[in-house]
């Protein structure tokens, strides 16, 4: 008796499955096709992204080789084009190359390119903080106190690995201008931090012991 009931239940269940498949056949086929298409598009996107990265690397390497070979025609414009690609690797590298080799000397234009990389390029958090720090370092010789702090505040008010670097830059900024009270405040912050750069902490402690 139990076997007959089990057989009936099995047959009923199988019949329900058949009916469901029959009724929803088109929906199932469409869903499978849509899922397959999404997978294909995803891998196609990755392939296109990888090819774009390779081409960008080739462009950047070609520019730097030509520059070092003293072929400097249109170097600035070509590097700016790479910056405007908003690539997480080669846009910052192109900006650094422009600055380090003094290809671009107008401060306003350089700061615009810094902002382009910082605000429009998808970067890892600490890479972004590094670029913000580099912007502060670049501007530290000619900006006012409030302007420099405005640049570095996103790092100073965070727990970034670059926080001690930013604090040290501000401390040295005030020290070079003879503002020892303000300078000491930032050296003290560095020494009192738990998670900081050991070298910067040591240099800050030396400065405090020697000059305050």
State what each model feature region is:
Residues 89, 95, 102, 113-212:
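Soluble extracytoplasmic domains of inner/organellar membrane proteins
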Residues 53, 72-73, 107-108, 145, ...:
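TPR-repeat structural position
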Residues 62-93:
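Short extracytoplasmic
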Residues 1-37:
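N-terminal positive-inside, membrane-proximal cytosolic segments immediately preceding the first
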Residues 2-10, 65, 119-123, 127:
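Acidic, proline/glycine-rich low-complexity intrinsically disordered segments
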Residues 47, 83-85, 119-123:
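Flexible helix-coil transition and linker loops at the boundaries of alpha-helical arrays
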Residues 2, 10, 54-60, 69-76:
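Acidic, proline-/serine-/threonine-rich low-complexity intrinsically disordered segments
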Residues 38-58:
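Transmembrane signal-anchor/signal-peptide helices with a preference for the extracytoplasmic
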């Amino acid at each position: 008796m139990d076997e007959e009931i089990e057989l009936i239940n099995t047959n009923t269940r199988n019949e329900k499955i058949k009916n469901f498949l029959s009724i929803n056949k088109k929906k199932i086929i469409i869903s499978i096709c849509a899922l397959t298409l999404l997978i294909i598009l995803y891998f196609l996107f990755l392939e296109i992204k990888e090819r774009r990265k390779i081409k960008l690397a080739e462009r950047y390497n070609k520019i730097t080789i030509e520059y070092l070979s003293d072929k400097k025609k249109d170097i600035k414009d070509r590097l700016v084009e790479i910056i405007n690609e908003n690539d997480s690797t080669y846009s910052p590298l192109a900006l650094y190359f422009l600055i380090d080799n003094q290809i671009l000397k107008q401060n306003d234009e350089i700061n615009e390119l810094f902002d382009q990389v910082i605000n429009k390029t998808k970067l890892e958090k600490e890479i972004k903080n590094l670029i913000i720090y580099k912007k502060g370092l670049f501007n530290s010789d000619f900006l006012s106190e409030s302007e420099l702090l405005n640049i570095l505040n996103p790092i100073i008010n965070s727990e970034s690995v670059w926080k001690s670097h930013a604090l040290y830059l501000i401390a040295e900024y005030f020290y070079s201008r003879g503002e020892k009270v303000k300078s000491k405040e930032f050296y003290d912050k560095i020494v009192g931090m738990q998670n900081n750069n050991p070298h910067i902490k040591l240099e800050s402690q030396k400065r405090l012991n020697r000059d305050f």
